[in-house]
Design a protein with these regions (language model features):
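Conserved PDZ fold ligand-binding element
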Residues: 91-113, 329-332, 336-337, 341
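Gram-positive cell-envelope targeting signals
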Residues: 1-57, 171, 354, 359-361
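Serine endopeptidase catalytic core focused on the charge-relay Asp
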Residues: 148-318, 322, 331-332, 340, ...
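PDZ/PDZ-like groove recognition
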Residues: 65-95
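Short, flexible surface segments
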Residues: 71, 98-99, 125, 269, ...
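PDZ-domain C-terminal substructure recognizer with occasional recognition of PDZ-binding tails
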Residues: 64, 97, 117-157
Length: 361
């Protein structure tokens, strides 16, 4: 029979041995962390030397069509009206100019040309319209007196405006946990004004590629396709400097993509890499490239300089063409960036964006 004293004599050596092993084990872990270039912060969390922490996404490469309606309406230019005084310019210089975004008329939000028409034709006649617009990122107010157009029998401002943007590009990645996607690697801009319009509502689709216009010196090529004849893939929510963003709602589409580990910008080195893209809208293929150099000094979406070395892509498209923006760049089995621009004078070369920058949005 054991007495209390005997039990204590047995327990103490065991406790001491356990503490010794624990100290050695903890010390081993600390030494391992210290020698792998990481550090322990004072809050007890592991810092990874400014690299993107180990994250897995689904690799893109699909050519997708997109269409969205903007917040506010974009001014493209003046439109002469046929009034009782013949054809006239109703808008004075600098009152509203190409590239302005009209967001309110008479304190009412406007997002379509029809919104503006309704407000103008339901206010007292001959009363000036109060306009709130955005010019180069800054809001300003002005007034315009609508004119009665005899051809349409409606009051109008005398402006060409638009509120719909569409195009095609390449999907970069999908987050498997949230089903959020990113594509293009740069903002979508209106072709006439260069203005990037904010998204009110939009969608992305599978894109049917009809052909390829090859890039030649001085003239960038392009993928040519039908934008809205494909299957709806998801919702477009944001148009930002680092790409377009939204949510994939087509579950079958998500399941067709393979996972890949994200690499931080500090993992990129000059040398061989791959880009993934589709030239027919159906099959995603990997093509050889060479990363020439990187710029880590906040170069926007021109962080990476790359060169196409794959003869298949050079023969088929002449190099990088419009529609390939967003094509994932993979090096050493990790997603490190996306193609964003082509050199106009050399279609075999272009720029890319660090994947870190796309993920930060």
């Amino acid at each position: 029979m054991f007495y209390k004293k005997d039990i204590i004599n047995l327990i103490w050596p065991s406790i001491f041995a356990f503490l010794c092993v624990s100290i050695v084990f903890v010390n081993t872990i600390f030494c391992f962390i210290a020698t792998t270039g990481s550090e322990i912060s004072l809050t007890g969390t592991l810092a990874l030397n400014n690299e993107v922490s180990a994250k897995t996404v689904l690799l893109g490469g699909d050519t997708v069509g997109f269409e969205y309606y903007s917040r506010g309406v974009l001014v493209l230019g003046k439109n002469k009206l046929f009034t009782k005084d013949s054809f006239v310019d109703n808008v004075l210089d600098n009152q509203l100019v190409q590239g302005d975004i009209i967001v309110m008329v008479n304190d009412q939000e406007v997002n379509t040309p029809e919104d503006i028409s309704y407000i103008l034709n339901n206010q007292p006649q001959d009363q000036p319209a109060n306009i709130k617009a955005i010019r180069k990122g800054k809001e300003y107010d002005t007034t315009i007196r609508p004119a009665y157009d005899l051809l349409t029998k409606k009051y109008k401002l005398g402006l060409w405006v638009k509120n719909k943007i569409n195009g095609l590009g390449t999907l970069t990645y999908i987050d498997p946990n949230t089903q959020k996607f990113a594509a293009l690697g740069h903002s979508v801009q209106d072709v006439n004004t260069g203005v990037a319009l904010n998204v009110k509502e939009g969608e992305i689709y599978e894109c049917n590629i009809l052909g390829i216009k090859r890039g030649v010196r001085g003239n960038a090529g392009e993928l040519r396709g039908l934008l809205k004849n494909g299957t709806k893939l998801g919702i477009l929510e944001q148009n930002l400097a680092c790409g377009i963003y939204g949510s994939i709602t087509n579950e079958e589409f998500i399941q067709n993509h393979m996972p890949i580990v994200v690499g931080g910008k500090s993992t990129i080195v000059p040398g061989k890499a791959l880009i993934y893209c589709s030239l027919d809208g159906k099959n995603i293929r990997a093509y050889d490239i060479e990363i020439i150099k990187t710029n880590r000094q906040n170069a926007g979406n021109k962080d990476i300089v790359l060169k196409i070395t794959d003869e298949r892509l050079l023969n088929a498209a002449g190099g990088i063409v419009q529609g390939m923006s967003g094509s994932p760049i993979v090096q050493n089995g990790k997603l490190v960036g996306a193609v964003t621009h082509v050199f106009v004078n050399d279609a075999s070369k272009g720029f890319g964006i660090f994947i870190d920058n796309m993920l930060s949005n």
